[in-house]
């Protein structure tokens, strides 16, 4: 669905910022995967000039520009997902709303490029003591979920897993138990040791115990970024004067080679942020 003329026009236009590093990363090579983790901020009518209706075209156009293979999104309500599904014709999605297991509440969907990937299996579990049941876990404030899928890369035949999640913003016990639950689920499912990718808004900084669980078992693609780097953080809260100080959004991987990774500054035509979180983006290659 990509239009090369529109790609170069938008990329050169001055209304938004995308790292020049990624202007050369838009087309995945035969044995590579481009992966994005992005909390797009739910459609909140109280967000004023930052409401979804003012941001949605920029988010969709950005995805069209870079044409990733996988996008783990967070805070996606059903109408937002419908818009993205209609706009991004190269992509399909998996996931459910966390409040009813269907369409109610926020999704943590996985969008995938169906021209390059074949979906093999998918499911969603709740981050709680009863993961197969719609539930609030431990001391969490809300229902939290993890949506996962197994894919086959059409060009190489390589199979791999993707897990996408959004941790609770309140419950300390919930966050550490959620990390343990996801790690255990991966070990249970991945009996063939296929590559694994984990995307998400974890509502946690890198020095916390739940993040250490993932860092000890997987590669945190941005772990080596200096804390004083200009692009270190991922959460701005829509503050136009802030680049984001806290790093709470992540991509982890195991069984792949990380070629490039960065946080993307993405703005709308009015100069505001396209979301209150920055996208995390990485390119991987299969190990041969």
Predicted regions and their residues:
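N-terminal, active-site-proximal structural segment of metallo-dependent hydrolase catalytic domains
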Residues: 2-8, 14-87, 98-106, 180, ...
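Extracellular/periplasmic catalytic domains that process cell-envelope and extracellular macromolecules
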Residues: 28-30, 64-65, 87, 101-104, ...
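Active-site beta-strand/loop signature of hydrolases that rely on acidic residues for catalysis
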Residues: 34-40, 59-84, 111, 149, ...
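Acidic/histidine-rich helix-loop elements
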Residues: 37-57, 103, 127-141, 168, ...
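Solvent-exposed loop/turn segments at secondary-structure junctions
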Residues: 40-43, 77-80, 98-102, 116-117, ...
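Short, solvent-exposed loop/turn elements at domain surfaces
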Residues: 42-49, 73, 120, 172, ...
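Structured beta-strand-rich core segments of catalytic domains in phosphoester-bond hydrolases
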Residues: 70-160, 260-265
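Metal-dependent phosphoester-hydrolase catalytic domains
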Residues: 116, 173, 177, 184-196, ...
């Amino acid at each position: 669905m990509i239009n090369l003329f529109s790609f170069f026009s938008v990329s050169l236009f001055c209304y938004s910022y995308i790292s020049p590093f990624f202007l050369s990363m838009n087309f995945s090579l035969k044995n590579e995967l481009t992966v994005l983790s992005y909390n797009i901020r739910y459609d909140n009518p109280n967000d004023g000039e930052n409401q979804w209706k003012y941001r949605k075209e920029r988010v969709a156009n950005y995805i069209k520009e870079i044409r990733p293979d996988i996008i783990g999104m967070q805070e996606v309500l059903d109408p937002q997902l419908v818009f993205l599904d209609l706009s991004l014709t190269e992509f399909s999605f998996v996931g459910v709303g966390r409040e009813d297991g269907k369409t109610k509440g926020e999704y943590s969907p996985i969008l995938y490029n169906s021209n390059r990937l074949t979906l093999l299996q998918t499911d969603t579990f709740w981050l709680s003591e009863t993961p197969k049941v719609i539930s609030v876990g431990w001391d969490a404030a809300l229902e939290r979920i993890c949506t996962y899928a197994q894919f086959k890369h059409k060009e190489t035949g390589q199979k791999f897993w993707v897990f996408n999640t959004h941790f609770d913003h309140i419950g300390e016990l919930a966050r550490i138990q959620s990390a343990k639950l996801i790690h255990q689920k991966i070990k249970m499912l991945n009996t063939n040791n296929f590559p694994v990718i984990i995307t998400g808004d974890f509502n946690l900084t890198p020095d916390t115990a739940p993040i250490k669980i993932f860092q000890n078992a997987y590669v945190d693609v941005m772990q080596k970024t200096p804390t004083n780097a200009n692009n270190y953080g991922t959460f701005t809260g829509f503050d136009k004067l802030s680049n984001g100080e806290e790093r709470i959004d992540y991509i982890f991987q195991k069984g792949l080679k990380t070629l490039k990774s960065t946080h993307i500054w993405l703005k709308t035509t009015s100069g505001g942020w396209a979301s209150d979180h920055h996208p995390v983006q990485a390119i991987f290659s299969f190990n041969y």
